[in-house]
């Protein structure tokens, strides 16, 4: 998993509350269990005016020019600003996969659905909770000024706007450690490889009958 220490990125404002995982990545695109390849169909039903299906050439589809991610000011955005209860609905892990494959590194919202919030950390996507007032203030400036950028300092736990005071955010220390060091569940396990091998050797010595050939 890629380390997340500090990130400066363009902000895209998705001014919708209660965005569910089926809106993030529709169900017809969930046939793959790879973590990549979902970005082209992120928010598919909002980005396009026609119905999408797996394997389709998106270049030939009808684009919804009114949707924020299709607008020139937000091309290349890596920080998503949105409203409360983002990621509600089913527990599909494909939702953070799609957001990351599209290029997002962090999401800022007043609240997240619990399962989606946990899945983000497991995959290296940083979900940041700010107050309703701070999120509203960011919406005002981001929506009025194209190309607005924000710096996220994970170590200092701050969202740093182009103008104004830094906004502190809370994060669990263990999750922060994992993101700073690029550790997912597999990486955490591999960090303990020597201890695991030592334990297995001690088990063979203590309980040889368990490992005897039958």
UniProtKB/Swiss-Prot annotation:
EC number: 4.2.1.33
Annotated keywords: Amino-acid biosynthesis, Branched-chain amino acid biosynthesis, Leucine biosynthesis, Lyase
Superkingdom, taxonomy of origin: Bacteria
InterPro entries linked: 3-IsopropMal_deHydase_ssu, Aconitase/3IPM_dehydase_swvl, AconitaseA/IPMdHydase_ssu_swvl, IPMI_Swivel, LeuD
Listed SUPFAM superfamilies: LeuD/IlvD-like
GO biological process per UniProt: L-leucine biosynthetic process
GO MF annotations, alphabetized: 3-isopropylmalate dehydratase activity
Catalytic activity line of the entry: (2R,3S)-3-isopropylmalate = (2S)-2-isopropylmalate
GO cellular component: 3-isopropylmalate dehydratase complex
UniProt keyword Kinase present: no
Annotated pathway: Amino-acid biosynthesis; L-leucine biosynthesis; L-leucine from 3-methyl-2-oxobutanoate: step 2/4
CDD domains (alphabetical): IPMI_Swivel (cd01577)
Subunit structure comment from the entry: Heterodimer of LeuC and LeuD.
Family of the protein in this entry: Belongs to the LeuD family. LeuD type 1 subfamily.
Cited function: Catalyzes the isomerization between 2-isopropylmalate and 3-isopropylmalate, via the formation of 2-isopropylmaleate.
HAMAP family the UniProt entry points to: LeuD_type1 (MF_01031)
UniProt name for this protein: 3-isopropylmalate dehydratase small subunit
């Amino acid at each position: 998993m890629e380390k997340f220490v500090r990130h400066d990125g363009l902000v895209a404002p998705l001014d919708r509350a209660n965005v569910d995982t089926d809106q993030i990545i529709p169900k017809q695109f969930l046939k793959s269990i790879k973590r990549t390849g979902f970005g082209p169909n992120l928010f598919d039903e909002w980005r396009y005016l026609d119905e999408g299906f797996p394997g389709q050439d998106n270049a030939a589809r009808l684009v919804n020019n009114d949707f924020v991610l299709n607008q020139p000011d937000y091309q290349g955005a890596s920080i998503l600003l949105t409203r409360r209860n983002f990621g509600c609905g089913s527990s599909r892990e494909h939702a953070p996969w799609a957001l990351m494959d599209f290029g997002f590194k962090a999401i800022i919202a007043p609240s997240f659905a619990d399962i989606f919030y946990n899945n983000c950390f497991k995959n290296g996507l940083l979900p940041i909770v700010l107050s309703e007032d701070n999120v509203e203030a960011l919406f005002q400036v981001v929506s009025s000024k194209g190309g607005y950028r924000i710096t996220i300092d994970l170590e200092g736990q701050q969202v740093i706007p182009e103008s104004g005071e830094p906004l502190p955010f809370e994060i669990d220390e263990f999750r922060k450690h994992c993101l700073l060091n690029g550790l997912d569940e597999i990486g955490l396990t591999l960090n303990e490889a020597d201890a695991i091998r030592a334990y297995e050797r001690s088990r063979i010595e203590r309980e040889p009958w368990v490992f005897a050939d039958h």
